[in-house]
Amino acid sequence: MADTVRKKQKLVVVGAGPVGSLAALYAAARGDEVEIYELRGDLRDPSTVPLNFTKSINLALSERGITAMRHSNREDLINNVLRGTIPMHGRMIHGRDRGQLWEAAQAYDVHGRAINAVDRSTLNNALLDELECTPNVKLFFNHKLTGADFNARKAWFERRVPGEAPLPNSANRVPEIEVDFDFMIGADGAHSAARYHMMKFARVDYQQEYIDTLWCEFRIPPTEDGDFRISPNHLHIWPGGEFMFIALPSADKSFTCTLFAPAAHYKHLGSSPQNLVESFKDHFPGVCPELISPGDLQEQFATNPHLPLISLKCKPHHYNSSIVIVGDAAHAVLPFYGQGLNAGLEDIRVLFEFLDKHGSYNLDASPDARREARAKAFQAYTDQRCADTHAINDLSKQNYLEMRWGVKTPLYKLRKSVEEALDRYVPRLGWQTQYSRVSFSNQRYSEVIQSARWQGRILGLGLATTLISTVGVIAYVFWKKPRQHSPGGLLRYSWRRLSSIWVSMFRTIAYA
């Protein structure tokens, strides 16, 4: 019995959000003694204020996140979570033309796959409930990480329980506890205390950026009959060039909406209630008063915080065998690809695959051998994951431009149509849109970028070939028989010749 206890590792997880909670489930399933420390109170308590100071943020759960949750081997958990989601099969673009409101659907995937809108609290509560039922997991809320020694494997937490009196003769300091561990996982968000203390030991390259965009949350209420006011199976976008308004469905038949705009535009909107209403009418047609009344719009804009958007990159994601950081603590990304949550959950799957591969959970190994194996696993994780998280960071920035402007351009629609047609009709090519690769596969993010660039070069070659061939065919026909072809006949002949060229080119690619 003593030998069994000796072989168990002790893991400290900092942060009880979805990513930290999933990490705890993975470790507990492998026999670790797990302790989770969370700065805030119990996240299942509605009175607990989230770190972003809002209470109803919706998340997009796609293939990467679902796969990571399935690998926890808690089928009931993932099934319960998915039952509470709303599938979104594509974007619904809104606009106005000559005074008439219009909307146009753009499917995410030619095969009908969808991403899932899920309430943050629904996901987090399900994970925490599962952890509470796991015997080798302990939850500690209202605990702030104040220090760590990653050579001695010790950490210190202040216990900030509401109503708890300071200890006698403590100069009113809150109680502090010392915790020993074998390794720590830092999953405490973009302003991570775990990362801060790790940087005292590791040489971390760190890049943080605030883009000139603020966001504010709004709500479209259900109809008087308790139904959705607009299609629930789409992510609704009102693109506005420099800004945009989006809406995601919620389980209570409302929509959680977000206004993204530069700080200067927020200042203009806040200068008078009339500016806010008029701006929405001009730039986001059909929102006010059709979906949100002017009074509600003004109240929500005044009440809800106007928050910045942060992105960060860092390397490495670990120090020796003592600590590894995951999720936003390692790679906060902008929300415009819906991959922040999914990338964080995928971190956990990839991390524990490396831990398993390198023998960190080999119970026959000595503690020193397991530490050495864990150090190798952490290094392999950093080597792979830094490249991928930097890639999704860049993709998320690029997608902001696409969402607020590109979705309406003919070039975007043309490329999307061509790529989807190739995916549907010539599957042997392995052709997919970049969005499908990101959202509906587990392909590494860095490889997604490489695939998208290759496809872009092929499409560019195809376009150039088409233009050159068109000119060549027309010149040939006029040179051979300048008077024997009507314009209609010339076009039909040119189309047959060009079609044969395209078929030949893609057949060559398919069988290469």
Swiss-Prot record:
Cross-referenced Gene3D superfamilies: FAD/NAD(P)-binding domain (3.50.50.60)
Cofactor field: FAD
Gene Ontology CC terms, in alphabetical order: mitochondrial outer membrane
Reactions mediated catalytically: L-kynurenine + NADPH + O2 + H(+) = 3-hydroxy-L-kynurenine + NADP(+) + H2O
Acyltransferase recorded as keyword: no
Enzyme's top EC category: oxidoreductase
Gene Ontology terms, MF aspect: FAD binding; kynurenine 3-monooxygenase activity
EC number in record: 1.14.13.9
Disulfide bonds: none
Homology family: Belongs to the aromatic-ring hydroxylase family. KMO subfamily.
HAMAP family noted in UniProt: Kynurenine_monooxygenase (MF_01971)
Name of the molecule in the record: Kynurenine 3-monooxygenase
UniProt source species: Neosartorya fischeri (strain ATCC 1020 / DSM 3700 / CBS 544.65 / FGSC A1164 / JCM 1740 / NRRL 181 / WB 181) (Aspergillus fischerianus)
Encoding gene per record: bna4
